[in-house]
Swiss-Prot record:
Induction: Expression is regulated by the hypoxia responsive morphology factor A (hrmA). Part of the subtelomeric hrmA-associated cluster (HAC) containing genes that alter the hyphal surface (such as reduced total chitin or increased beta-glucan exposure) and perturb inter-hyphal interactions within the developing biofilms, resulting in a loss of vertically aligned polarized growing filaments. Consequently, this hypoxia-typic morphotype (called H-MORPH) with altered biofilm architecture leads to increased hypoxia fitness, increased host inflammation, rapid disease progression, and mortality in a murine model of invasive aspergillosis. This is Subtelomeric hrmA-associated cluster protein AFUA_5G14880. InterPro entries: Aminoglycoside_PTrfase, Kinase-like_dom_sf, Mito_inheritance_9. It holds the Pfam family APH. It comes from Aspergillus fumigatus (strain ATCC MYA-4609 / CBS 101355 / FGSC A1100 / Af293) (Neosartorya fumigata).
Length: 509
């Protein structure tokens, strides 16, 4: 900013992972200051990777992202915290314009997004991991790309949270061997009895990346996990579940994983925005032109079939074929009340965005569309996500995901090989039933959050705090009142939105 000081500093926003401030210089110029919270991710790596990702996208791929003016990857500075100073983009968030856009504007925005994603998909990264500047990473842990950009360890918080930061686990970077794109060569090499240099190349396949989360959690569970009751909302247990139940399922996944790997470009190292939501896309005021995409914290380079998918603002059901029918509003839309109109318009816009994003991707980003056509891609990605969740005695969804993938009608579309994991019909029925109960529980919990106006972690805006606290108290009491005899205490204890130190007993009926 070339100013001695900023006479005006104002907080713009605060979330679970960042505090955002506006700094105004004496000449009136404004910049954004982002300070990560302690839970945002690993110290140094989180900030260093976000900066390098934005710089790479802006300088190399010429994409509209904020310019970084200065940053610090250490808290040993006058601020006392890591920070990023970046350009303040004078734009309107797509979320603020979403329901007022015309269909033609939605089409235009989806085309722009698809074209930007194509530029990212077209870049050939040599490895999986996160982006960094050379100066911000130890030379032993970097793989050069272009200019001073390198690939280093994954900066995702999941790989560093809690005990993981002190555990020897695979965080990358993982260089991609050209051999991994030619499975017939790998098949030959794997039969060789001796460990030559070529044999080592087999270990550099996408499989290392796909299984890293499962191997990470197994390492942590084996060292630190203890038996505990399941505390899932509406599905708690009054008995302990042993961690071996979790590691057993992860072991079964590791048997399945090699069959999920796709050769060639399907596994190409690909960068993707970690949260391409409406609020992270900025438009030029009064237009449909995208002028900036923000919040690249936690962006990683992973196999393409792990990265492919639809943005959150698309209403896409991966279990159903993509419909080409143009969505429309009901004939009696104009006769509805304002609230009902907003609900109907929101659904209509999601369906519209899904259709035009699909069309734009098919025309402008063929590489992405090819991956989206992989049979049961959504089920495979869901299973991969489940393998990365920490031990909490709730393995319902991991088990259900494994059961789903190994169902003969599904497996036959994924692999021509025999499935290495088998479940009895009784086990399958039990897993599906538990999963249905879990989904019903989550739907109810979602309604609770909506009623209280709180986020997933129970956070809310300051103006809503007192109302949320009182509403939460009443709902908790009502939950206990409706519980079956003998279940009141466990329902009270397992209420999801209570203080950690709350060891109180339920009120007497």
């Amino acid at each position: 900013m070339q100013q001695d000081y900023c006479p005006d500093i104002a907080k713009l926003a605060e979330g679970g992972f960042n505090k955002v401030f506006i700094l105004r210089a004496k000449n009136g110029r404004e910049v954004i200051a982002r300070i990560p919270t302690p839970i945002a991710g690993p110290a140094h790596y989180t900030t260093a990777s976000e900066v390098a990702t934005m710089d790479f996208l802006r300088a190399v791929l010429k994409l509209p992202v904020p310019e970084v003016f200065a940053y610090s990857t250490t808290s040993e500075n006058p601020v006392g915290a890591e920070y990023i100073l970046m350009e303040r983009v004078e734009g309107e968030s797509l979320s603020s314009r979403w329901l007022s856009l015309t269909t033609d504007e939605v089409k235009d925005i989806m085309i722009q997004i698809a074209e930007m994603e194509r530029k990212i998909f077209d870049f050939r990264f040599p490895a999986y991991g996160s982006l960094y500047h050379t100066k911000d990473l130890d030379w032993k842990h970097q793989i050069p790309i272009v200019e001073d950009f390198v690939i280093g360890p994954v900066s995702s918080r999941e790989f560093w949270h809690g005990e993981r930061s002190k555990t020897e686990i695979d965080r990358g970077p993982c260089r991609v061997s050209p051999l991994s794109t030619f499975p017939f060569i790998l098949g030959f090499l794997e039969k060789e009895p001796t460990g030559t240099g070529l044999i080592i190349a087999v270990g550099l396949s996408p499989l290392d990346c796909v299984t890293s989360a499962a191997r990470r959690e197994m390492a942590v569970i084996q060292r630190h996990a203890k038996p505990q009751p399941r505390q899932t909302f509406l599905l708690p247990t009054n008995y302990n579940i042993h961690p071996s139940e979790h590691t057993s399922l992860l072991s079964q996944f590791l048997q399945v994983a090699p069959h999920l790997i796709r050769p060639g470009s399907y596994s190409a190292p690909t960068l993707r925005h970690p949260d391409l939501s409406l609020s992270n896309i900025l438009l030029a005021p009064g237009t449909s032109k995208i002028i900036s995409i923000i919040d690249w914290q936690g962006a990683t380079i992973l196999p393409r079939f792990m990265q492919a998918g639809y943005p959150a603002f698309c209403h896409h059901d991966s279990s159903q074929p993509q419909s080409l029918e143009i969505p429309s509003l009901p004939d009696d839309f104009d006769k509805m009340g304002i609230d009902e109109q907003r609900q109907i318009k929101a659904i209509f816009r999601l369906e519209e965005a899904n259709l035009y994003y699909t069309a734009a991707t098919g025309v402008h980003n063929e590489e992405h569309m090819n991956v989206l056509k992989i049979p049961h891609l959504g089920m495979q990605q869901y299973l991969l996500r489940q393998t990365g969740y920490p031990w909490d005695a709730d393995v319902i969804n991991l088990r259900a995901a494994l059961v789903g993938i190994t169902t003969p009608s599904v497996w036959s579309k994924i692999s021509s090989a025999a499935c290495p994991v088998e479940f009895s019909e009784e086990e399958r029925e039990a897993a599906i039933a538990e999963s249905q109960e879990w989904n019903e529980s989550e739907q109810l919990l979602s309604r609770v959050r909506e009623h209280l106006n709180i986020d997933l972690e129970g956070g809310t805006e300051p103006d809503n705090f007192e109302r949320a606290v009182e509403g939460n108290r009443q709902l908790r009491i009502e939950m206990v009142r409706q519980a079956e005899a003998g279940q009141q205490e466990i329902c009270w204890r397992n209420w999801p939105y209570k203080d950690q130190e709350d060891n109180s007993m339920p009120p007497q009926r």
